[in-house]
Amino acid sequence: MHSRQRIVHGVLILALLGTFAGLTSCELFPPPTPTTPPSPIDFARVLDYAQRSALVYDSDEVIRQKASPGATVTISPATPTGVKAYVETNDANKVQWVVVRGTSNLANVKLDVDYNKVVDPRLQVPLHKGFAEAALVVYHFVKTLLKPGYETRVTGHSLGGAAAVIVLMLLKEDGVTLGPAMTFGQPKVTNRQGAAKYRSLPLLRFVNDKDPVPLMPPLDLFSLLDEGPFQHFGPEVVLGNGTMYQYYPEHQAERFSVTSFWQTLGQQEIPDHPIARYIQSLQQKIGH
């Protein structure tokens, strides 16, 4: 953006700050009302996805040992930033899985937050630059392994979930047969334009009630004036204690302030964010 435009935008931001002073994000953007899901959520099936999202954090040997019987598993080498993926192919039922692990360093969510407007000529939507770069590495790894006509299921946790969503977008453009995709504790990857274009994807996002990572990156007034703020797409299931959960047909507004959390991201523990905590919550939903 040119410096003069930035100055004008800066003046507008000051005006907006004056207008919105004292208002919370929930007051600016009223949260949607939880609804009944179109069909009952099969938490046993969701747990299957979450366990794969956990497995990708293990060693290659453990991944192969714990893969489904009769499945073929191909594992990517980890990148210097820790991004890794594996493809699990089951020829008997013609199902293939793409499981993505992102970097374990949450501070990387803050890196390269600028939108990259042309990540791939097929997408043409703004994306979080860091997530897009990770997703492209995974995409180039998996695209030669996927078998035509097989149902393709995509999953990932945290930053791996963010990369998994972008991989899902790319696979849609390839005409791949997509099965249900599920992510856990996934941060935002695109803006309103991207959300509108890809909201028909078979994506279901799971969020622990006190996990702030899915609220990242937070609302920023500069982004309101540029490409627009980061925004989720796909229904959201907020996991509460015990058997409690709420279903939202779209992302709900921020449940709590994340400004201070964003400033110290990567420097503190987040008890509700680890994949083990998601698995524990899902097990409670099915009585384990």
Which residues does each PLM region occupy?
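Intrinsically disordered, low-complexity segments
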Residues: 1, 22-23
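Bacterial N-terminal signal peptides that target proteins for export
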Residues: 2-12
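Bacterial N-terminal signal peptides
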Residues: 11-22
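Non-catalytic, mobile gating and regulatory segments of ester bond hydrolases
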Residues: 26-155, 159-288
